[in-house]
């Protein structure tokens, strides 16, 4: 959808603009972030023993290994690894937040999807559409059966694995929400 002056998305920055404005982190800045994360998780995160046992994760070791491999990482790969380490904790209160210009930004599609039940079958329907989005037959109430070529149920489950949430239902809820609204 093209942005127009009347569109509510008109003032939203494009991802390409955001990426172009990002300053890469120096090696020292990356090391500082990793070391701060090590202190946070190893010395302050009281649920670490529980999370290790429940989810078979070792974020302290992953951070140690990341620290040793930092020189070969792009910013994108570094941030992806940090996000993965924190998501592995499956703790909604412990997150890795991207630096500026991404901090506080959300990538958003101009519609929402919600799940509902029809008998024993879960269905996914478009439940909200941004003002000005007119793409018939797409609109409110349309059933979504696939996402990026993947059956929607599987797409939601895969997306849920990329989100914090310590049980299947929490991951499903986060996976569904973040299909169309993804914090950067």
Where are these regions (language model features)?
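Flexible, low-complexity junctional segments that flank or bridge functional domains
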Residues: 1-184
């Amino acid at each position: 959808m093209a942005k127009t002056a009347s569109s509510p998305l008109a003032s939203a920055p494009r991802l390409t603009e955001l990426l172009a404005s990002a300053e890469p982190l120096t090696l020292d800045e990356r090391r500082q972030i990793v070391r701060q994360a090590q202190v946070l998780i190893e010395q302050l995160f009281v649920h670490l023993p529980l999370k290790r046992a429940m989810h078979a994760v070792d974020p302290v070791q992953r951070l140690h290994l990341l620290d040793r491999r930092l020189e070969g990482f792009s910013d994108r790969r570094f941030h992806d690894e940090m996000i993965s380490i924190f998501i592995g904790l499956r703790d909604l209160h412990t997150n890795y937040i991207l630096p500026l210009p991404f901090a506080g930004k959300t990538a958003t599609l101009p519609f929402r999807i919600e799940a509902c039940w029809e008998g024993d079958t879960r269905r996914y329907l478009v439940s909200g559409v941004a003002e000005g989005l007119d793409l018939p037959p797409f609109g409110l109430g349309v059933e979504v059966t696939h996402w990026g070529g993947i059956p929607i149920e599987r797409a939601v489950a895969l997306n849920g694995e990329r989100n914090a949430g310590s049980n299947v239902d929490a991951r499903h809820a986060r996976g569904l929400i973040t299909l169309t609204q993804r914090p950067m």
